[in-house]
Amino acid sequence: MVAMGVTAAMACASLVAAPIVAQAQSKTQANQQKDVQVIAFQQTWNTIAKECTNTYGPEGVAYVEVSPPQESIQGTQWWTSYQPVSYKLDSKLGTEAEFKNMVQQCSAAGVGIIADVVLNQTTGADVAAGDQKGVAGSEYNGSTGSYPGFATKQYPDGITAADFHSCTKNISDYTNQKEVQECRLSSMWDFNSESEKVQDIQSDYLASLWNAGVRGFRMDAVKHIHTDSVKAIKEKFAKKIGKNANDIYWIQEVIGNASEAAGIQPSNYVQNGTVTEFGFKSEMNQTFKDKIANLKGLSDRLSKDLSSDDANVFVTNWDTARNEGALTYKDGAKYQLANAFMLAYDYGTPRLLSDYKWDVNDNGAPGATATSVPDVDMDKACSTNDSDWNCEQRWTSTRGMIAFRNYVNGTKVADWQDDGGDNIAFSRGAKGFIAINNGKKDKDASYTTSLADGEYCNVYATMDCSKTVTVKGGKVETTVPAHSAIALYAGATKASHPAASAATDPSDPDVSQEEDDALPDDRSV
């Protein structure tokens, strides 16, 4: 959420490609349940609007989460978006009009918008004295705690120092709940979330997002706000839009740590909505760098803290990617395979990251200035795997696994198989089957599956069904290439799979070097 450092911009690729037509919205899948979310990190509203039409809608994505849409401090770094100076819907990612157009365009494509919402804090207090201006021109004074840009009809003076908690020290003791929820996170002014005034202003902001068409809310740094205050803000918001608070989709960022205060643990927040399950991220990082066979029983382990229905899972997000302890695009095939596992598994609601390439953790989006981020033509940027953008949402494996997940939703993991090391396989009821080889050698194996006999498309590897796997007598006799997977589902057979304009997407990362030492393995699974 918060960082300090240097920014750099990278040049955009120059090739242009037409949007890839892929399999996700075939008639065999149109009625399947959708739950996949994509985090479109630091992407402008115009960029996302077009990508909803070209990619997210056709591929069956349920929601796209956008970076904080409110006005923030100036700066090229990505984390400036997390320091609001007003709740105006004018940010470096676009204007209010562009934001509303994006929501409409995505809705027309069947994709809901989740807004990343920052309610815990404003800006850093350790700044030079004097007035500053936000990206949309709102004046504020971070040294005195004066933020007139938060003004509403009810509170025309906006936010003053009296509207923040009195504690001025930085949080250091996470065993002390009061300190965590009333002192400053990285020197930023901490809203007095118990205040009626603060709750009124913040619930007005949430209502403005709802009225713009937003249908999901990811609450940033919510462990720093007391659960009772979160509940009060949500209920005020619900009343203003005429909804039941329980009917509002609410995702809460709570990083669990057993050594911290009991009152800030994830389980305390499920009364208000779903919670991000950081334990899943840690499991992905540990197992894909060690033995993925250790993923056996993962759902049982994680469910001790959060039920599947309460958990939002991810391999990485923008924060964890820029810190230790998470897989990222820099991990090559491991990152792809971990995302495939997440989409194939039956625990939690999956969240994929669509990110840009970076060398310095603080770097903003390519081409970012202190007040704006340029629009990106993803058709152009994703026409190569050497772009400034990773284009994870367009990778062949991503497209195939979203389709897989939408088809198998509602079924449970069955037929778990592993070799104690780098190879696992499991079915999703009688609807799907996946085998993952995280090893350096090809894996020859005979797997058990609940899929019916037939010839199935390997949707992890191709979009046009040019690679198939046969199921016969409840068995899959196949070779899983090193650092790869096979993913089969009943809606994608050789006979029923719709046509695609290409076998693979040009944005696919090059993992050939990782596969150079691939050699045949045994049939021990």
Summary of predicted features, one role per range:
Residues 1-23:
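Secretory targeting and sorting signals
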Residues 27-38, 45, 50-57, 61, ...:
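Active-site-proximal helices and loops of the catalytic beta/alpha 8
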Residues 31-35, 72-104, 141, 146-192:
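Aromatic- and acidic-residue-enriched carbohydrate-binding clefts of CAZyme catalytic domains
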Residues 37-47, 188-199:
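Active-site mouth loops of central-metabolism enzymes
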Residues 94, 197-201, 334:
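Short secondary-structure boundary/capping elements
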Residues 127-149:
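Flexible, glycine-rich active-site loops centered on histidine and acidic residues
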Residues 498-525:
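Ser/Thr/Gly/Pro-rich low-complexity, disordered linker/stalk segments of secreted
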